Amino acid sequence: MVSKLTSLQQELLSALLSSGVTKEVLVQALEELLPSPNFGVKLETLPLSPGSGAEPDTKPVFHTLTNGHAKGRLSGDEGSEDGDDYDTPPILKELQALNTEEAAEQRAEVDRMLSEDPWRAAKMIKGYMQQHNIPQREVVDVTGLNQSHLSQHLNKGTPMKTQKRAALYTWYVRKQREILRQFNQTVQSSGNMTDKSSQDQLLFLFPEFSQQSQGPGQSDDACSEPTNKKMRRNRFKWGPASQQILYQAYDRQKNPSKEEREALVEECNRAECLQRGVSPSKAHGLGSNLVTEVRVYNWFANRRKEEAFRQKLAMDAYSSNQTHSLNPLLSHGSPHHQPSSSPPNKLSGVRYSQQGNNEVTSSSTISHHGNSAMVTSQSVLQQVSPASLDPGHNLLSPDGKMISVSGGGLPPVSTLTNIHSLSHHNPQQSQNLIMTPLSGVMAIAQSLNTSQAQSVPVINSVAGSLAALQPVQFSQQLHSPHQQPLMQQSPGSHMAQQPFMAAVTQLQNSHMYAHKQEPPQYSHTSRFPSAMVVTDTSSISTLTNMSSSKQCPLQAW
């Protein structure tokens, strides 16, 4: 046997024999270390804690602890000083006061666990608590241990004093027997258990009856204190097996009926019994962990509330993101928030004059070919404010000056896009688009009387604004007809400066004829409002009937 031992084990055996332990005592101690059948988790299956090489002592540890005279330390006491004096726990005094055979067995069980490796015992107790859903608060209430110290000892193997470990092991042994009795009770005795539980609840609500019922010689203060602490009801805690069943049922039905909830109760209790290693027919032994229909109903109600709350948070986050993303678009896209690019000391907009090089001229030429007609006009504007349009832009005529743009660059050429789309769908209508000053309308009215009226859409883009524009005054002198159409801009007085753009497509396959007669000359510029008009041939007669003394504001579509 010696040959199978390591050098460390041989040294430990030699130290034990040299300390006065005889061979018979050592063999008897080894026999007592064998696990009992009803102990629960076997200690042999648990690994040893690192660095624990002390051989278990064979002296009866429990009796030396309960009398308060033992000063020696066992394995696990090193570094366990936490600064407080821990007297003999009441649970140990209570077990010492009992002289029954069951109490003797419990004391022997505690002595055996104290002689084992503390880390292995801690893992065994932790596994048992998880298996039966026992909270650490219950251990703290019964043993008087510090919950933080208890948690570190069970999870990390933090060293603990021998007295504290003895109190923990005593609770563990008694809890094992208590749960075993609960599951071993027959169905006939379930009624007695119900009466006892109701009596315990009454004593918990009215503790004065418990004090009156106890005689002076029945039990001392040390024995009654743990009993009063045990009267505290444990909070119900869902086990992992039951939670898995409930979440699967929640995916199928978020609001089950009463019959479905009762079926879930049976299924959960069955799973809890299988988790504890007992028959499902002994579900009444679950005690405070018994699943009821009310608890299932509350679980589903809480899940629905949590889901609704998460959806509300998601909607609020989505709305806030949409608001933040729209604010820059509104600030940059609104026509009333665009800053002017012209200096403040200069006149914003475009100036117009009737003399010298600043004169604004327009000419019109009428060309007929079948049922189509086109009027072209050109306006050359003087640039006053800084221009933001490239001189090489394709919207400028080859021989014309740069168009003055106030308030920023030109908007996208949506008008031309619409014209091109119309030309693809109805090329006949796209040939009748006319852009001319209102003064030219009076001149060409007679020539268009014989033309067939067609419905041609009027296209006018005012940078997305639907407000009326202030007319721009033009001089009414007409010149040669061979000029390209230009777009112009009219600043509004009651709104921010916005670029006005109008475009017209030239007549396809049109024939330009020589100018034979001059249209009527109009010397006074206030006779007609000089707003640029984009219209069709059917609306020319309507425009000619308008009063020449009134202004005709343009509206944007």
Swiss-Prot record:
Residues 93-188 form the POU-specific atypical domain. PANTHER family: HEPATOCYTE NUCLEAR FACTOR 1 (PTHR11568), HEPATOCYTE NUCLEAR FACTOR 1-BETA (PTHR11568:SF2). One of its GO terms (molecular function) is RNA polymerase II cis-regulatory region sequence-specific DNA binding. It is found in: Nucleus. Residues 64-85, 324-370 are annotated as: Disordered. PROSITE patterns: HNF_P1, HOMEOBOX_1, HOMEOBOX_2, POU_4. Pfam families: HNF-1_N, HNF-1B_C. Keywords: Activator, DNA-binding, Homeobox, Nucleus, Phosphoprotein, Transcription, Transcription regulation. Residues 1-32 form the HNF-p1 domain. Residues 231-311 bind DNA. GO terms for cellular component: cytosol; nucleoplasm; nucleus; transcription regulator complex. Transcription factor that binds to the inverted palindrome 5'-GTTAATNATTAAC-3'. Binds to the FPC element in the cAMP regulatory unit of the PLAU gene. Transcriptional activity is increased by coactivator PCBD1. Residues 351-370 have a biased composition (Polar residues). Residues 1-31 are annotated as: Dimerization. SMART domains: HOX (SM00389). The modification Phosphoserine is found at S49, S52, S75, S80. GO terms for biological process: anterior/posterior pattern specification; branching morphogenesis of an epithelial tube; embryonic digestive tract morphogenesis; endocrine pancreas development; endodermal cell fate specification; epithelial cell proliferation; gene expression; genitalia development. Gene3D superfamilies: Homeodomain-like (1.10.10.60), lambda repressor-like DNA-binding domains (1.10.260.40). InterPro entries: HD, HNF-1, HNF-1_N, HNF-1_POU, HNF1_dimer_N_dom_sf, HNF1b_C, HNF_P1, Homeodomain-like_sf. It comes from Pongo abelii. Binds DNA as a dimer. Can form homodimer or heterodimer with HNF1-alpha. Interacts (via HNF-p1 domain) with PCBD1; the interaction increases its transactivation activity. Residues 328-344 have a biased composition (Low complexity). Belongs to the HNF1 homeobox family. This is Hepatocyte nuclear factor 1-beta.
